[in-house]
Amino acid sequence: MRAFLDLNSEEIVAWLKENNEKSFRLKQINEWIFKHGELDFNKMTNLPVRLREKLKENFLLPSLKIIHSKKSRDGQSIKYLLKLKDNLGIEAVLLKYRYGNTVCLSTQVGCKMGCKFCATGLGGFSRNLTAGEMIEQILVLKASSSEKITRVVLMGSGEPLDNFTEVLKFMRKINEKDCLNISYRKITVSTCGMVPQIKALAEEKLPVTLAISLHAPDDALRNELIPINKRWGLAELLDAAWYFIDKTGRRVSFEYALIENVNDTVEHALKLAQLLQRKLVHVNLIPYNTIEKRNFKTPSVEKINKFKEVLKRAGIPVTVRRELGDEIDGACGQLKAKYFEV
């Protein structure tokens, strides 16, 4: 039996027609699910009883369950530990900013990439999430918090472009007017550097934001921190980024976690500036969040500001990311499913 949210609109309309039902029923079903948060076909009372019975016989509705949630002291972030139908665990985070509410979602259970400073890969990789399971995360966080979701970032556990087909399907579906109606411009896709998939995403010409986890300004250091760099080095990665800009007209965001005595010197900043000058980019500096089992530390505020100033003087737009959720293991690099460790 298929999960209803795994199907795109064309697939559902085709199923309705095969079962002698009118295609407008899809809009009614979507209204129940996405507007009212109703996840029981029986309670969709403007559908004929016969259709409700057919839906129950053929499709599963969301089964994602909240196992645990933890709110930050300032109330601006909530981390959720969620259990999938096969009892595997994933994490999602609700982040409240002045401009609206952002959800940080997982795209895989675990991760294959093995980045040396990240917590997610410590537990290994289990499987990809389906498009429906990504949508479920939004529905669960929305229902639990009673907050309107305005932005989506795919920066939870997993490498989004390693699950390219399902991520693409997910983005298309949440963009639909009768579903969540989230603008592509309010979706951020993160990657540690899967070059062919960056180019494939560019070919789709969706005006999403691409966020590249760079974290080093040269191949020698990046090879140490991000193993996938040994397959596609900086030159290839940057070529793919410029290709994405050319195809979409969208600025690329480069994420750079500042780690004490690893990648945080003025020399590193100068190298980074040289790589990115005169390009349509933005640099997000992320003060490293200390992680248990990772022997890295956060630089001083003085070093962070010096690094930032070098980039600013080079004319590169740069911000120091305001981290919400670090105290609840919910910030970048800290999405750990401690609850599920046995």
Swiss-Prot record:
Matches recorded under InterPro entries: Aldolase_TIM, Methyltransferase_A, RlmN_N, RNA_MTrfase_RlmN, rRNA_lsu_MTrfase_RlmN/Cfr, rSAM
A GO MF term: metal ion binding
Annotated binding of S-adenosyl-L-methionine, by residue: 158-159, 190, 213-215, 289
Binding-site list for [4Fe-4S] cluster: 111, 115, 118
Co-factor(s): [4Fe-4S] cluster
UniProt keyword list: 4Fe-4S, Cytoplasm, Disulfide bond, Iron, Iron-sulfur, Metal-binding, Methyltransferase, rRNA processing, S-adenosyl-L-methionine, Transferase, tRNA processing
One GO CC term, this protein: cytoplasm
Record localization: Cytoplasm
Note on cofactor: Binds 1 [4Fe-4S] cluster. The cluster is coordinated with 3 cysteines and an exchangeable S-adenosyl-L-methionine.
First-listed, main subcellular location of the protein, grouped into a coarse class: cytoplasm
Catalytic residues (positions): 91 (proton acceptor), 332 (s-methylcysteine intermediate)
Miscellaneous comment text of the record: Reaction proceeds by a ping-pong mechanism involving intermediate methylation of a conserved cysteine residue.
Protein name, entry field: Probable dual-specificity RNA methyltransferase RlmN
Organism (species): Carboxydothermus hydrogenoformans (strain ATCC BAA-161 / DSM 6008 / Z-2901)
